[in-house]
């Protein structure tokens, strides 16, 4: 009973807090201004304003949000009485006449004049010290642009072509001068300012203010934006001035390709950034989690947060490609910045949908990100000796921000965070791999020297006698642990495949039902097999055998983890390092227990002497023949004959075994009873004797009765915490990815794996747990199995996501509505849509867009994104005027010029049937060489993004000369496509309105591509 009580109490004491931490958010303080310079109420009101409409980059609402942000920044600076500058043009010097009475509408594009340079040193190579420098500068960046390419999606067969992109940015950048920054306007693009170190470098906080076209952007990324605004307020509050300068980047264009962050890199302020904090939202509400970090040094900054959350396992998932989505973090890391990626991560069912609004998040969630950001930025801005100096990778053309070291980190109950270097973990791994087996071998050697190594001991002949050998039964229980573990694990993983086959998305809304089923199944199967083995053949060595098998298996796993640490810099193996260390200590104690046993030769001699003393006893002598005080039945020949099972032994019954099952559930490992000693143990001078537990080997009577508790405390509490919270985080992040096209089996396999790892610490003691616990778990298993097989996987709180797009052929007027997702549920949604009634719904795959989904299409209601026809006139009549495209071929050359203009959109794309090798957008800035415009394999698409409405694109395109052809012999064909993404006005996209109105409550719609509506015209040149 003691084993049962202790294990139940320990598991409950750990699991309940873990679930509370996982499911709840720490309460925000009652005082909204608990930090001087922060105002939670103000931030919440800002979030409400920011998220009151869809505001993708290609929408009018996006412009309104941007203007509001400019005004809001100036209001914050005004309220703090801060002197600041404003400016737009990257080639301009900010006007110093602007002070705290500036207004957003007064921001003008400034030009360079002699007055702007008053107070500067005549020699621009020297530091020009001004008497009064503005504390902040607002850059209204309407100049920076970006040109590059990306390879087509993974899974497309054949050569991977590129998707080239030209993007015009309109970011908002706020610079807050630090006390150790230079006092001049060093960002001016005049030599030598842009090519040298400016002070000790600055720290950037980044958030994007655009949303997707189907989400209000409260969490993605409104929370990050209002947090950034509060950081502007905090660091410009008197008394909070940072040592190192702070750059607040509010970028625009993240959702469609991380374009805002990429455009920022061409701004002069980009050379000042040494460290960064990226704020994101990949869920909707909950806690903000540390997704990943560039090194251990910056991670220590986040560890200062009041409620840190995260594990390096998530960073490994990104690094190894298991997590396919990306954030602005990858842009800054590639530039050489050192920093952190902090994001909300669940529930993913609300991500990019109309439930990403203020109603479905909370002030508590906002405070969790805000308080963590303040603590992180305080650390990064005050530690001025870090993030400065030669780079560890010796890369040229990147900021000189010092040497970072790969890190390992994980939180404990959301209260504190452990951070250390990967090299430290690697050293621990090697030490455990090398030292632990040597120590166990040394202990085994010492036991053998003292003739107390009972493991694997068989029959032993008494010394100096010719009588038959005495069986010590040391092999009993030697192989039961791996066999039972394999069977239990196989059945548990088999249940995962069962759910994948019959109800593959039940984990989407009922992950705890899946967890409960998996945990209870593994526990019940393992207990039943192990308790059965103990009932049939009880062994005092069961526990030490189990620990040694765990040690051997863990050692093999640790070898793999160590290889990944060394070669691939994967840090998530810390789980197995800690696990193996705990198993080693428990196994070490298990071996040391054997020192308490009598020597084997004394046991054999005693058994032989007792055999000689018993006249008429004709059974083969063995160690259990030692006389010990107990029931007369145990001393009888009949009891002795029953001790050895045979083919005639009853499965349940017999004098010896009738008491075994009951004894197995006693309150301790063995009972202490004073008794006179006859035989072997008397030679050791013992006055009292203990009898063996149940029908275990009689020589085991002197084994300690308390060491199991020490072993369990080493194996259990800490490892249950570490494994449990990693399992909850990783599984929680993946359970709702099935509707995105991710593998449906993966969440179930992970639940099975972590269920085994969580139960594993108690497995060496499992046979001592009373039948009440497995009976309870068996009932849970039956109930959850039935539920998981028959329950509907979605609900109004956990909605299935379908991906929407409408395509229009502007030449013919034909339009097609597409819903993508898991086909079974997409067809169920379409069945309720009136315009799709009586149509033949065709479904298929399209790996070029997104793998793992089915794309179902029908003829839909015509869109009205361009209001160019009178009321009552079919929209098709105006399609041809939505976009105009003209293609001019250069005579005798493989070159053409595209003139493209479109109404009410800032985004178009040219799709080619065959690849091209070069392109140039008229008016674009010259490439800085960071990226290739076109990859070596060529591109077949050019994405074009303007910052202004109704502007014409002029694009020159060149393509290669094929073998056997001359230049000018070949042309190109394809389609010119433009996107419309503004869904704020009801009736602009009637097909989407219809889907949202008639789809079931358990479903939601989100965007499929960059545009909700895609209009196209064919070209041949």
Located regions from the model:
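An N-terminal domain-start capping segment
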Residues: 1-13, 245-246, 250-256
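Extreme N-terminal flexible tails
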Residues: 2-34
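Alpha-helical transmembrane segments of integral membrane proteins
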Residues: 11-14, 436-861
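Soluble extramembrane regions of membrane proteins in the secretory/endomembrane system
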Residues: 23-420, 937-960, 1020-1021
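Eukaryotic basic, amphipathic alpha-helical target segments in cytosolic regions
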Residues: 58, 310, 381, 770, ...
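Extracytosolic and intramembrane catalytic regions of membrane-associated proteins
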Residues: 67-175, 182, 189-193, 304-307, ...
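Intrinsically disordered, low-complexity domain-flanking/linker segments in eukaryotic proteins
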Residues: 78-135, 143-158, 180-199, 392-398, ...
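Non-cytosolic juxtamembrane linkers/loops
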Residues: 348-516
């Amino acid at each position: 009973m003691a084993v049962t009580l202790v294990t139940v109490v320990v598991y409950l004491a750990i699991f309940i807090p873990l679930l509370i931490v996982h499911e709840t958010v720490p309460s925000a303080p009652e005082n909204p201004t608990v930090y001087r310079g922060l105002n939670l109420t103000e931030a919440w009101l800002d979030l409400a304003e920011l998220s009151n409409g869809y505001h993708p980059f290609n929408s009018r609402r996006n412009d309104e949000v941007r203007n509001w942000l400019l005004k809001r920044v100036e209001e914050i600076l005004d309220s703090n009485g801060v002197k600041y500058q404003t400016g737009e043009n990257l080639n301009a010097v900010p006007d110093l006449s602007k002070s705290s009475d500036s207004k957003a509408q007064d921001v003008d594009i400034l030009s360079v004049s002699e007055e702007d340079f008053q107070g500067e040193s005549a020699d621009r190579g020297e530091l020009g010290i001004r008497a009064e420098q503005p504390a902040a500068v607002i850059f209204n960046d309407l100049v920076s642009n970006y040109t590059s390419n990306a390879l087509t999606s993974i899974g497309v067969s054949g050569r991977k072509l590129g998707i080239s992109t030209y993007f015009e940015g309109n970011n908002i950048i706020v610079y807050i001068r630090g006390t150790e920054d230079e006092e001049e306007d060093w960002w001016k693009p005049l030599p030598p300012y842009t090519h040298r170190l400016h002070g000790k470098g600055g720290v950037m906080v980044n958030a994007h203010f655009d949303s997707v076209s189907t989400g209000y952007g409260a969490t993605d990324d409104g929370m990050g934006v209002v947090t950034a605004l509060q950081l502007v307020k905090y660091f410009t509050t008197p008394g909070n001035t940072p040592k190192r300068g702070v750059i607040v980047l509010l970028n625009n264009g993240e959702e469609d390709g991380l374009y805002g962050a990429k455009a920022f890199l061409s701004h002069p302020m980009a050379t000042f950034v040494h460290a960064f904090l990226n704020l994101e939202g990949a869920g909707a509400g909950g806690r903000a989690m540390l997704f990943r970090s560039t090194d251990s040094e910056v991670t220590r900054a986040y560890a200062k947060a009041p409620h840190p959350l995260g594990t390096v396992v998530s960073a490994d998932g990104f690094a190894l490609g298991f997590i396919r989505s990306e954030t602005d973090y990858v842009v800054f890391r590639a530039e050489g910045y050192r920093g952190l990626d902090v994001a909300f991560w669940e529930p993913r069912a609300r991500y990019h949908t109309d439930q990403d609004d203020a109603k479905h998040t909370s002030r508590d969630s906002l405070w969790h990100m805000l308080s963590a950001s303040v603590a992180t930025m305080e650390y990064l801005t005050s530690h001025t000796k870090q993030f400065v100096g030669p780079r560890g990778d010796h890369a040229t053309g990147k900021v000189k921000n010092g040497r970072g070291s790969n890190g390992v980190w994980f939180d404990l109950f959301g209260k504190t965070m452990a951070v250390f270097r990967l090299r430290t973990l690697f050293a621990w791994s090697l030490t455990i791999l090398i030292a632990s087996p040597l120590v166990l071998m040394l202990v085994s050697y010492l036991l053998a020297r003292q003739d107390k190594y009972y493991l694997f001991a068989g029959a032993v002949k008494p010394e100096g006698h010719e009588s038959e050998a005495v069986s010590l039964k040391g092999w009993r229980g030697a192989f039961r642990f791996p066999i039972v573990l394999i069977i239990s694990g196989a059945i548990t993983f088999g249940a995962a495949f069962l759910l994948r086959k019959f109800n593959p998305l039940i984990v989407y809304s009922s992950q705890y039902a899946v967890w409960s089923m998996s945990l209870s199944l593994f526990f019940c199967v393992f207990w039943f097999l192990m308790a059965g083995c103990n009932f049939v053949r009880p062994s005092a060595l069961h526990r030490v055998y189990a620990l040694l098998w765990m040690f051997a298996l863990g050692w093999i796993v640790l070898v793999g983890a160590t290889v990944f640490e060394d070669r691939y810099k994967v840090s998530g193996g810390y789980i197995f390092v800690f696990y193996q260390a705990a198993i080693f200590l428990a196994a070490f104690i298990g071996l040391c227990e054997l020192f308490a046993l009598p020597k084997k030769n004394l046991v054999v001699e005693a058994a032989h002497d007792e055999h000689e003393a018993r006249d008429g006893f004709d059974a083969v002598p063995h160690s259990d023949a030692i006389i010990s005080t107990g029931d007369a039945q145990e001393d009888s020949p009949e009891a002795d004959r029953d001790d050895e099972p045979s083919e005639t032994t009853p499965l349940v019954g017999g004098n010896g075994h009738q008491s075994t099952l009951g004894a197995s559930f006693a309150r301790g490992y063995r009972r202490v009873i004073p008794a006179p000693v006859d035989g072997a143990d008397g030679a050791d001078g013992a006055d009292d004797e203990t009898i063996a537990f149940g029908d275990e080997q009689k020589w085991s009577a002197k084994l300690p009765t308390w060491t199991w508790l020490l072993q369990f405390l080493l194996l259990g509490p800490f490892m249950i915490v570490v494994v449990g919270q990693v399992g909850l985080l990783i599984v929680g992040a993946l359970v709702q990815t099935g509707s995105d096209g991710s593998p449906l089996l993966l969440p179930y396999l992970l639940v099975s794996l972590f269920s085994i790892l969580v139960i594993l610490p108690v497995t060496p003691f499992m046979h001592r747990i009373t039948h009440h616990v497995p009976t309870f778990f068996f009932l849970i298993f039956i109930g959850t199995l039935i539920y998981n097989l028959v329950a509907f996987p979605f609900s109004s709180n956990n909605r299935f996501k379908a991906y929407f797009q409408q395509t229009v052929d502007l030449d013919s007027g034909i339009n097609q509505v597409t819903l993508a997702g898991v086909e079974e549920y997409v067809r169920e949604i379409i069945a309720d849509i009136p315009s799709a009634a009586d149509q033949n719904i065709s479904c298929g795959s399209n790996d070029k867009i997104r793998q793992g989904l089915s794309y179902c299409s029908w003829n839909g209601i015509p869109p009205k994104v361009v209001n160019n026809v009178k009321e009552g006139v079919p929209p098709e009549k105006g399609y041809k005027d939505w976009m105009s495209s003209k293609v001019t071929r250069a005579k005798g050359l493989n070159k053409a010029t595209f003139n493209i203009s479109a109404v009410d959109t800032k985004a178009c794309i040219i799709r080619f049937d065959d690849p091209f090798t070069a392109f140039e957008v008229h008016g674009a800035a010259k490439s800085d060489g960071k990226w290739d415009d076109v990859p070596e394999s060529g591109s077949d698409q050019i994405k074009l993004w303007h910052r202004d409405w109704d502007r014409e694109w002029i694009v020159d395109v060149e393509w290669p000369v094929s073998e056997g052809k001359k230049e000018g012999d070949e042309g190109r064909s394809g389609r010119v496509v433009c996107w419309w993404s503004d869904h704020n006005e009801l009736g602009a996209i009637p097909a989407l309105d219809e889907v949202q109105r008639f789809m079931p409550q358990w479903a939601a719609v989100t965007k499929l591509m960059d545009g909700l509506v895609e209009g196209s015209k064919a070209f041949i040149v």
